[in-house]
Amino acid sequence: MKPFPRAEISRKALQANLARIRELAPQSKIMAVVKANGYGHGLLNVANSVATYDQGADGFGLARLEEALELRSGGVNARLLLLEGFFRVTDLPLLVQHHIDTVVHHESQVEMLEQAELTTPVTVWMKIDTGMHRLGFSLAQFDAIYQRLLACHNIAKPIHLMTHFACSDEPDNSFTQAQIDAFESVTASLDGDRSLANSGGMLFWPQSQRDWIRAGIALYGVSPMVGDKGGNHGLVPAMELKSQLISVKDHQAGDSVGYGAFWRARKDTRIGVVAIGYGDGYPRHAPEGTPVWLNGRRVPIVGRVSMDMLTVDLGLDSQDKVGDEVLLWGSALAVEEVADHIGTIAYELVTKLTPRVAVALLP
């Protein structure tokens, strides 16, 4: 018997998305970004699905060292990059031992590299802040820091170079081009690989594609742009979040449903209860009208989302019954559409599922 709620992860979809990304960026290597438990899809589920498919992903991007070590212990031998870099000097021997690249974005990391005693140099990606103003060295700092990295015996040469876009999901926003130009202004004559494009850069700013692209949300079949869908770019949703009806009851006009008697039926209707709630990661603030997919149609959420359940207005003439499968998002109901209704982004929905949701990797 299948558990509910459950997230079904399609290996076929992940592989199809990898192939599509190669079509979109044919001259670049692909770094599959699998941080945050593979964007909620399961770290090893994703990595093993795309590590050896066709050419396979050329590398994997992680946020934390623990994620990289999990990939290594899971048998993934591809190139790994810590996108936030290392946090402690004691992390450095682990980078050497497990052949893990690191971003360097702050002078404190440079100091740790200069002071460490390592048996083998570490491969470094110098992050340049071209306008995101989160991590990275400013353009004014660049030359001095780059020279220190060149002089450091604990750093493998050449030094690789990267930046991160603030607005790449906005095709009409010239800020991304300004970031590209800023990056080129300080790196044009230097050796080493370059990585500028994230999913938004790959899709909407092809001129940002360099040696490596960092494919995050696109790998999972989702568009980074609000109001857009991955399917518009030939991408396939990799996750289907499913549950089932556990109650179907008739209610009269004026009956309230849920905590706070927040919603009242405007006419006689039939209410279904779905076994999923904010304890599973479905947002409590989902407003009335947020759709779920049931028996071939969109059905609106009514009342407040509870910890373990949410309620939907089936309509008085519906034939839905207890045990019927409910799709919260997936192929028939894009996660981007659900996110738009809720007032969030698809990234947040897929990454916030809790351990109560069973995750199953399908062929």
Curated annotation (Swiss-Prot):
InterPro entries, alphabetized: Ala_racemase (IPR000821), Ala_racemase/Decarboxylase_C (IPR009006), Ala_racemase_C (IPR011079), Ala_racemase_N (IPR001608), Ala_racemase_pyridoxalP-BS (IPR020622), PLP-binding_barrel (IPR029066)
Keyword Methyltransferase: no
Record carries keyword Isomerase: yes
Cofactor(s) essential for the protein: pyridoxal 5'-phosphate
Residues with PTM N6-(pyridoxal phosphate)lysine: K35
Top-rank taxon: Bacteria
Pfam families, alphabetized: Ala_racemase_C, Ala_racemase_N
Entry EC number(s): 5.1.1.1
Gene3D superfamilies in the cross-refs: Alanine racemase, Lyase, Ornithine Decarboxylase, Chain A, domain 1
GO cellular component, one term: cytosol
Biological process terms in GO annotation: D-alanine biosynthetic process
Listed pathway(s): Amino-acid biosynthesis; D-alanine biosynthesis; D-alanine from L-alanine: step 1/1
Keywords, in A-Z order: Isomerase, Pyridoxal phosphate
GO MF term set: alanine racemase activity; pyridoxal phosphate binding
Binding site for substrate: R134, M307
Known catalytic reactions: L-alanine = D-alanine
Active site: K35, Y259
Function description: Catalyzes the interconversion of L-alanine and D-alanine. May also act on other amino acids.
Similarity-based family: Belongs to the alanine racemase family.
The name this protein goes by in its record: Alanine racemase
Protein species of origin: Shewanella denitrificans (strain OS217 / ATCC BAA-1090 / DSM 15013)
